[in-house]
UniProtKB/Swiss-Prot annotation:
Annotated binding of phosphoenolpyruvate, by residue: K22, N23
Keyword tRNA-binding among UniProt keywords: no
Example GO BP: regulation of cell shape
Pathway(s) of this molecule: Cell wall biogenesis; peptidoglycan biosynthesis
Organism: Helicobacter pylori (strain G27)
Function: Cell wall formation. Adds enolpyruvyl to UDP-N-acetylglucosamine.
Listed Gene3D superfamilies: Enolpyruvate transferase domain
HAMAP family: MurA
Record-stated family: Belongs to the EPSP synthase family. MurA subfamily.
Record protein name field: UDP-N-acetylglucosamine 1-carboxyvinyltransferase
Domain of life of the source: Bacteria
Compartments, record wording: Cytoplasm
Catalytic activities: phosphoenolpyruvate + UDP-N-acetyl-alpha-D-glucosamine = UDP-N-acetyl-3-O-(1-carboxyvinyl)-alpha-D-glucosamine + phosphate
Amino acid sequence: MDFLEIVGQVPLKGGVEISGAKNSALPILAATLLSQQEVKIKSLPQVVDIKAMALLLQNLGASLEWLDPNTLQICAKSLHHTEATYDLVRKMRASILVLGPLLARFKECLVSLPGGCAIGARPVDLHLKAMQQLGAEIKIEQGYIHAKAPKGLKGNDILFDKISVTGTENALMAASLAKGITRIINAAKEPEIAQLCAFLQSGGVEIEGVGSSELKIRGVESDALNLKDIQIIPDRIEAGTYLCVGAITNSQLKINRIIPNHLQAITDKLIEIGFSLDIQENSIEIYPAKQRQAFEITTKEYPGFPTDMQAQFMALATQCLGTSVIEETLFENRFMHASELQRLGASISLKTNVATISGSTELTGSDVMATDLRASSALILAALVAKGVSRVHRIYHLDRGYERLENKINALGAKVVRLKEK
């Protein structure tokens, strides 16, 4: 098992290029199961979750060829079975995304209940109800979802009681091959969903309301779905994380290959804290702040402040003047990084879903343990400003979602080394 050793308080400067968005790539990879045509997906990040999804597609019988480290050619014409086994699915929760495509195309599938980060319950009920609304029969037996629709899926209204990103994506993909018209009400509005819509539209699926909370989909036949090659959008959470690298170290950094509109909740908050930003068409440069002010954050669905950035901003809060407050409204049990930040010297108090962080704190290097993907990046941020050497353990969480993070940070001047546990 690997860990990162980080020397703190090293000056940083330069630029970093953002990788493709893991959270856009995963549903698009799953969507290739809908079609019998060959398609190329470009700008795939080389992270564990993408490799796991590619392996799952291959296990189902899809033909895969890596044309370069970030471009995958896929043809799902000759799938030989429709069972997503526990061994493959347990590694990440996003594997539930194969449920909609397999059910829609083959009228029956068996998908293991998924794994991934241990953040709250994250129930799959919303996915299952969506499939049932389209006419599927669902049973859960021995840890597997058995879904079938002998006469095929039929368009219908799907109302989500709670906004769900992956639930919306699964419903979108299933509706793409359903007969008639489907309306998804209270749909998630993330940019990653908009790109999935664009991918499905490229194959002939008619979708209205892209970017809104109500989507209207007119399905097509599988053999008529001709998906076009696509380039994955930049990862807004990775971009936000590197903006926080600049913010916590109070450095001048340029974040390249981004879509600034996707980052507005993050950049608005950084400006409120006291940073100057030069926002261009596909880059943002952050400049050192004369004084960093404490802040308040409440996580919300897009376009609100992303839950995937609250851990990084908690680390940043330790260096701001005054007391900051972060309220997590989307997931339970998502403050596990707080106790590890405390090991570095952070002053944080927790009350249910609210964290209060005292600022202007001198952090000291220590051994800390990553508990999930975004927590791992928060610990690295804190280690960059801590006095002395820190070691971040269990970075397999980090490798699920960040491409070559230590290489990118080291290119800015940091001293980060990946080592093996003894």
